[in-house]
Amino acid sequence: MKSYVEIVDVMARQILDSRANPTVEVEVVLEDGTVGRASVPSGASTGQFEAVELRDNDKAQYLGKSVLNAVDNVNETIATELIGMNVFDQTLIDQTMLEIDGTENKSKLGANAMLGVSLAVARAAAEYLGISLYQYLGGVNAKVLPVPMMNIVNGGKHADNNVDFQEFMIMPAGAPSFSEALRSCAEVYHTLKSLLQSKGLETAVGDEGGFAPNLNSNEEAIQIILEAVTKAGYEPGKDMFIAMDPASTEFYENGKYNLKGEGKVYTSEEMVEVYANLVEKYPIISLEDGMAEEDWDGWKLLTDRIGDKVQLVGDDLFVTNTKRLSKGIQLGVANSILIKLNQIGTLTETLNAIEMAQRAGYTAVVSHRSGETEDTTISDLVVAVNAGQIKTGAPARTERVAKYNQLLRIEEELGEVAEFRGLNAFYNIKK
């Protein structure tokens, strides 16, 4: 097997994501004709510190959302530099793109252009070797199947309803295996749908496959999910746990948390107490973006108050960025990071963020975006780094289900070696 395999072509095209918005797809071709292909997701609630997703802003095309400039950046600028390079030099390839871009936030080439190339390179390398992507990225030690964090009720930016918190999720941490975890989630999802129908509530699905019923409060969303869990034959707090993503930056105004759906405005201290009370009352195991991305003091209060018993995930807070994560670790803020490839824009930087988190005793939760494609890289990535948790939507809508189906294939391929850690995936909290 050759150790230097030349990249002979790099090409990008514009395709559509799951929200009918254009996104970037890249193909990397090797000297023997092997092709690696990857496409890039896009978020709805984006943190201000995320790497730049380059869009054309040409109102005559896709309402300004086209990505032809990013495509050109791949086909003209990046391709020229990468052709002739060794496909196995992932770090050098990513470094080369960072140097060509030269900006702090990837605003010249676009994180969407760079990520498409970065992932397609890794895919091409795995294809050439005839191994799965998770094996290529993680080696023989890649064996942990993740606990799903499934978004089944939506509010906030992901829905047109009275619920302020953006996502209410279930986590089947009591399941014995990934496939059983997936089954239990699907059963709860169907049961929830019937339950909503019986109450005369809306069952149309949102961007990530979750339901967006018009409930009276955030607490009602938790209650209705727990009712569905019990009805489906599972025990809350033993088989199935609740995870929430309030996405609080979205309702943080002038230093206060403005919950419009509930008609309440809270200080950081009061908001922490709202969460502490919910955690006391319900089997909540994970809370993402409980405080706003710039409310470091609020985050510290939250971590000190409930950080020993609940996973506190930084998404907008950390944006998969080692500089921001490093600050969080030093301040003792949060105990987990959400990993979104397109927040940072290269595979190398993503792996660095995961490694930094794990070394500090933080968990890493690998995540989709609300605008997705059929690309399943995150399924391989989560197993490659043994992260133990994945957030990739409801068990509905093919761009979500594709990720779960890929994990079923990986579980099957690993066979006896496959591990499902369940509650032990939460090594950052006391159980």
From Swiss-Prot:
The keyword Metal-binding applies. Keywords: Cytoplasm, Glycolysis, Lyase, Magnesium, Metal-binding, Secreted. One of its GO terms (molecular function) is phosphopyruvate hydratase activity. Binds a second Mg(2+) ion via substrate during catalysis. It catalyses: (2R)-2-phosphoglycerate = phosphoenolpyruvate + H2O. It is an enzyme of class 4 (lyase). Its cofactor is Mg(2+). The active site is at residues 208, 340. This is Enolase. The gene is eno.
